[in-house]
Amino acid sequence: MIGYKTLRKINKRLKAVKKEKAGRQLSPVRRIERVYPVKNRRICAMTFDDGPSAAMPSPQVNNSDLGLTETLMRILKAHNAKGTFDIIGTTAENYPDKRGKLHTASWGGMKHDHYPDFEMDHLAGAVNQPQLIQKIMQSGHALTNHGYHHILYGPINYVYRQRETYHNIYEVVEDLYTLHQTVKNALAIDMKFARPPHYIDRIKDGFDAYDAYALMGYQYLAASFDGGGWQPTTGHYDEDVEAMVRPLEKALLENPEALNGQIIFQKDGCNMSLQTPIVDALPKQLALLAKYGYEVVTVDELVNLSPFEDFGEGMLYFEAARALDRAGFIIGYKNNTFQPNRLLTMGELITMATPKTIYTAKCEAILKGDRKGKASKKAFGIHIDHHIHYARQEGYLGRMGTIDPEAKVTLEMMIDFVSAISKVKGNIEVTVLEPTGETYTRAEALPILEQLLV
């Protein structure tokens, strides 16, 4: 059997290939695992998966009757830190099932996950623990969507090959929507980020997590640093705790800026051996971060300050990019880069003037869709054709005929595009800056689009 370390190495290589490919496509959904460091600050975020949990920590904390999630919140408060809790709805409906083997990835169940443990589902999830999601928000933390049932979006070999999965995008969106509405009805908030169970993106019918998140209006919540606490025990609890602390300590010793702008993965649950080393490791991790001058904030705050991985404060036209992003336009690549010096194509110019709402408007159609037939990737998937159609429908293309999405944008093309949008919006005045070269870079388009759209 292939070991976890080998699988993680393979996965790391695959992620690098996928990330490079994702850097070629502008997308309403960006995979956010880190951001460009905020100027004059050391700042990072921590996410806590699979709760909220009222189960007691294991081993239990002395002189405390708090469940796991409240224990984590107490620790965060003591260190003036804010967390992002990546919550589930409930796994209580994931039966019939059989208990999995302890110390393995199937510890909670053979067909499905069960949190906090098999036949103890009532102790975790927003549905079963509504008071906990309320306390999370009241304490200044954030909530993100980890799936109502925490069922895999699609199959994966090796570790989860016996798991049952969703079959199509209808089921995935329904699952996300159900948890979204559960939280909205309870707290009057709209979650903005989601993370697929076990990071499995592909859905059996050809769609993927990005398509589903576009329909929901989410960004893809990833992570760039593993806080640990999920692997099987070494047989010694204290060693399990130190195994969570050492990598972070090593990273900061080698480079005090190593965690700046990063998102750290944590568990709001037990490891594969039904223990919670997070309880004793988290205070040490937070103390280390404080020693090096870090602020630990919610993912919402981190991304609001610095939306992209390669483009940030102090760079020419960054403020315009942030304004357009906050206004909901599709301006970043799928891998969360902006690539300011890349030459701008006509397809990208059109996309950057397209709001993400063209996808969320289709969510109701998916929820009410005929489940007997396969959903159309052309109709509901992320594609530049939707952006061109939107631009034409809005009158943004004026009298332009056939569009070549790969054509580099010249001054003449920019003037035609700006003139058409200006006319649609009531002849607003726009200063069109000339490109420094023969055609525009992506950054050079930003102040022009900001004048038009924000």
Where are the model-predicted features located?
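N-terminal propeptides
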Residues: 305-454
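Short acidic/His/Gly/Ser-rich catalytic and metal-binding motifs that mark active-site loops
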Residues: 94-96, 151-157, 229-231, 359-363, ...
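Soluble non-cytosolic domains of exported or imported proteins
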Residues: 42, 54-55, 59-70, 123-127, ...
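Conserved beta-strand edge residues that scaffold enzyme active sites
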Residues: 90, 150, 227, 303, ...
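Active-site beta->alpha N-cap acidic-glycine motif
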Residues: 3-196, 288, 303-307, 312-314
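Sec-exported extracytoplasmic/periplasmic mature domains
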Residues: 53, 77-81, 137-138, 177, ...
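Catalytic domains of cell-wall/extracellular-matrix polysaccharide-remodeling enzymes
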Residues: 123-131, 135, 148-265, 269-290, ...
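Extracytoplasmic/secreted envelope proteins and their assembly/folding machinery
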Residues: 69-73, 84-85, 129-133, 173-176, ...
